[in-house]
UniProtKB/Swiss-Prot annotation:
Family statement drawn from the similarity comment of this UniProt entry: Belongs to the argininosuccinate synthase family. Type 1 subfamily.
Annotated ATP binding sites: A8, Y9, S10, G11, G12, L13, D14, T15, S16, G115
Organism encoding this protein: Staphylococcus aureus (strain bovine RF122 / ET3-1)
Subcellular location, record wording: Cytoplasm
NCBIfam families given in the database record: argG, PRK00509.1
One Pfam entry name: Arginosuc_syn_C
Protein name: Argininosuccinate synthase
A cellular component annotation (GO) from this entry: cytoplasm
GO molecular function, one term: ATP binding
Binding, L-citrulline: Y85, N121, R125, S173, E258, Y270
Record-linked InterPro entries: Arginosuc_syn_C, Arginosuc_syn_N, Arginosuc_synth, Arginosuc_synth_CS, Arginosuc_synth_type_1_subfam, AS_cat/multimer_dom_body, Rossmann-like_a/b/a_fold
Length: 401
């Protein structure tokens, strides 16, 4: 009896070719495809997996689990890698790895294969996650092992009658889920080349956006958006709704050259309409609900959390601790944020919360002012004392300095 390998199958070029390649190596292939909100026709994926030679294909709807247990932390933690990338691909990898391990254990497979290249981040994310969940499972990386160029891979697919929706003229590599869409390869590899419109799918070009703005009210409960204009949604449905609405206005296009885990720079074209709107709104709500010290310290944790996730360390003691901290900051991050959507921009026009720390009577300069300005004199004396002592003992600073 042949040994079984579970393959993370997407229906794309890399994993379709990987099925045939693993068969040639003497394995039975168990394909596994997760739906994490990418809108893919999974019936077609299922059929393609079997047509290319897999003995089984498991289709798993993990959209709600993805939104509730993974994307929720991206929102509460304002997670952005290098202040640009909302981490949607990185967010899905630990969940995919978790499901692959479950299928491998159920089917008595000896290992797990993925379609990642040897120069990308995902090979690390998958294999480290698999080691964390079940160290006894072997990891297989066909694309890394065969080391073909994109053109050679396409030729192999054509030779073996593997149906793939890709050609030499438009060799994009696309990854998409509920939280966003990533596009690379082809002309996009030139960081100076303007991305053509066919590189985008979720967002309109500015020239095609409406000339009238939409204004919405996002309601949050403990850091998670739960309503749009008073209508309650599950998180996954809310994100999909915002993707359509914000994408219509051209919101969420990101052109970024990022520093990959493996040490190279990579030009990526991202689309994240809902993510841009939600994260802007969430940050705005935090400005009135977090204390000053938490508001100043939390970005340090957010940066570390984003790097943990980007670097494939979701299943780690540090990430567990970071999640606990993020959760602790969100107890009072509830309220409404008003946002204007127009011509590629998500503009925060207002925010309110039953837990607001903003006291208008303390902030106002009108006759309603309740701030005791006399207290400022003593505060300045104490606050400035170290500076004053330094000036007295060391001569202070000259005007030239």
């Amino acid at each position: 009896m042949k040994e079984k390998i579970v393959l993370a199958y997407s229906g794309g070029l890399d994993t379709s070719v990987a099925v045939q390649w693993l068969i040639d190596k003497g394995y039975d292939v168990v394909a596994c495809c997760l739906d994490v909100g990418e809108g893919k026709d999974l019936d077609i994926v299922y059929k393609k997996a079997l047509d290319t030679g897999a003995i089984e294909c498991h289709i798993i709807d993990a959209t709600k689990e993805f939104s509730d247990e993974y994307v929720s932390y991206a929102i509460k933690g304002n997670l952005m890698y290098e202040n640009a990338y909302p981490l949607f691909s990185a967010l899905s990898r630990p969940l995919i790895a978790k499901k692959l391990v479950e299928i491998a254990e159920k089917t008595n497979s000896v290992g797990i294969a993925h379609g990642c290249t040897g120069k990308g981040n995902d090979q690390v994310r998958f294999e480290v996650a698999i080691k964390a969940l079940n160290p006894s499972l072997k990891a297989f990386a066909p694309v890394r092992e065969w080391a073909w160029s994109r053109e050679e891979e396409i030729d192999y697919a054509i030779k073996h009658n593997i149906p793939v929706s890709i050609n030499h003229d438009s060799p994009y590599s696309i990854d998409q889920n509920l939280w966003g869409r990533a596009n690379e390869c082809g002309i996009l590899e030139d960081p100076y080349a303007a991305p053509p419109e066919d590189a985008f799918d979720l967002t309109n070009a500015l020239e095609e956006t409406p000339d009238t703005a939409d204004e919405i009210i996002l309601t949050f409960v403990k850091g998670i958006p739960v309503q749009i204009d008073g209508k309650t949604y599950e998180l996954d449905d809310l994100i999909l709704t915002l993707n359509a609405l914000a994408g219509k206005h051209g919101i969420g296009r990101i052109d970024h050259v990022e520093n990959r885990l493996v040490g190279i720079k990579s030009r990526e074209i991202y689309e994240a309409p809902a993510a841009e709107v939600i994260l802007k709104a969430h940050k705005a709500l935090e400005t009135i609900t977090l204390t000053k010290d938490v508001a100043h310290f939390k970005p340090i944790i957010e940066k570390q959390f984003a790097e943990q996730l980007y670097n494939g360390l979701w299943f780690s003691p540090l990430t567990d601790s970071l999640k606990l901290f993020i959760d602790s900051t969100q107890q009072y991050v509830s309220g409404d944020v008003r946002i204007k959507l127009f011509k590629g921009n998500a503009i925060v026009n207002g925010r309110k919360s039953p837990y607001t720390l903003y006291d208008e009577k303390l902030a106002t300069y009108t006759k309603e002012d309740a701030f005791n300005q006399d207290a400022a004199v003593g505060f300045i004396d104490i606050y400035g004392l170290p500076t004053q002592v330094n000036a007295m003992l060391n001569g202070g600073y000259s005007n030239e300095q």
